[in-house]
From Swiss-Prot:
Family: Belongs to the class-II aminoacyl-tRNA synthetase family.
Name the UniProt record assigns to this protein: Glycine--tRNA ligase alpha subunit
Record has Metal-binding as a keyword: no
Subunit structure, as described in the record: Tetramer of two alpha and two beta subunits.
GO MF terms held by the record: ATP binding; catalytic activity, acting on a protein; glycine-tRNA ligase activity; transferase activity
PANTHER family, sorted: GLYCINE--TRNA LIGASE, CHLOROPLASTIC_MITOCHONDRIAL 2 (PTHR30075:SF2), GLYCYL-TRNA SYNTHETASE (PTHR30075)
Protein species of origin: Streptococcus uberis (strain ATCC BAA-854 / 0140J)
Taxonomic lineage from the root: Bacteria, Bacillati, Bacillota, Bacilli, Lactobacillales
GO biological process, one term: glycyl-tRNA aminoacylation
Annotated Gene Ontology cellular component terms: cytosol
SUPFAM superfamilies: Class II aaRS and biotin synthetases
Encoding gene per record: glyQ
Cellular localisation: Cytoplasm
Keyword Ribonucleoprotein in annotation: no
Length: 305
């Protein structure tokens, strides 16, 4: 690697690459979430028959992973670059390796391994065949073929590529701490995110109001159900995301027991499944508008027979 790309140049390079491969460039979704997979641009669009190709950066919050800014690689919030393609291209792995070349990483000169790591997200009823991608001994990407999302089988199969941007940037810039990553010329990652990391960690582990969070979970759960009763998928899913983040805050605070934890996850999963089922039903009412006309007519005909 000759030129060491800044963090924002890595994002720009990936955006340009996947744009050229036919992906829409979406923007980060404005609700807290633990992973890019939970964005409606993946969770909802991975189900149903309509094609969908999108790429976006997603800040991902994981309260239990906060370390007050003292750990060089573990963060309350990190950034993922998410690529989702449906139906999955037959050459998706080759496209991924090509994207690494655009970042200055020649696959022929590095030890790049696809290590089997089947993926599951119990809180959304989602699972798939997956691999971790290791670059010279460090995991930089999660690669998944979705089999189930929101409790529904995915057909056609959706492929997901999730780059861990901090890890990728640490490797490209040859730094040991994420806080030393150059975000833009002359500006370090730590100058932007070290204080928020400390403050969010302190809040998550020490300050958050457990009673308020428990009450909020109940309110968000009820509101999600109420929205679903009206067939309002997207507002309902917003409240599912709020339930998920609230649960993660409770979990980080140690406010839920092992038994209670399983119960909360099941409650979120039940809502997510209802959202998924309702979304597909609503898209069908619209006549699956993203399908080409011939496929759309044939599919609607089959479903009415």
């Amino acid at each position: 690697m000759s030129k060491k790309l800044t963090f924002q140049e890595i994002i720009l390079t990936l955006q340009q690459f996947w744009n050229d491969k036919g992906c829409m460039l979406m923007q980060a979704y404005d609700n807290e979430k633990g992973a890019g997979t939970m964005s409606p641009y993946t969770f909802l669009r991975a189900i149903g028959p309509e094609p969908w190709n999108a790429a976006y950066v997603e800040p991902s919050r994981r309260p239990a992973d906060g370390r007050y800014g003292e750990n060089p690689n573990r963060l309350y919030q990190h950034h993922q670059f998410q690529v989702v393609m449906k139906p999955s291209p037959s050459n998706i792995q080759e496209l991924y390796l090509e994207s690494l070349e655009k970042l200055g990483i020649n696959p022929l000169e590095h030890d790049i391994r696809f290590v089997e790591d089947n993926w599951e997200n119990p809180s959304t009823g989602s699972a798939g065949l997956g691999w971790e991608v290791w670059l010279d001994g460090m995991e930089i990407t999660q690669f998944t073929y979705f089999q189930q999302v929101g409790g529904l089988a995915t057909q056609p199969v959706t492929s997901e590529v999730t780059y861990g941007l901090e890890r990728l940037a640490s490797y490209i810039q040859e730094v040991d701490s994420v806080y030393d990553i150059e975000w833009s010329p002359g500006v370090k990652y730590g100058e932007i995110f070290l204080q928020p990391e400390y403050e969010h960690s302190k809040y998550s582990f020490e300050i958050s109001d457990q009673v308020m969070l428990l009450e909020n979970f109940e309110k968000f759960e009820k509101e999600a159900s109420r929205a679903l009763e009206e067939g309002l998928v997207h507002p309902a899913y917003d409240y599912v995301l709020k339930c998920s983040h609230t649960f993660n805050l409770l979990d980080a605070r140690g406010a839920v027991s092992v038994t209670e934890r399983a119960g909360y996850i099941a409650r979120i999963r039940n809502l997510a499944r209802l959202v998924a089922k309702t979304f597909v039903a609503e898209r069908r009412k619209l006549g699956y508008p993203l399908l080409d006309e011939a496929t759309r007519v044939e599919l609607l005909k089959e479903e009415t027979e």
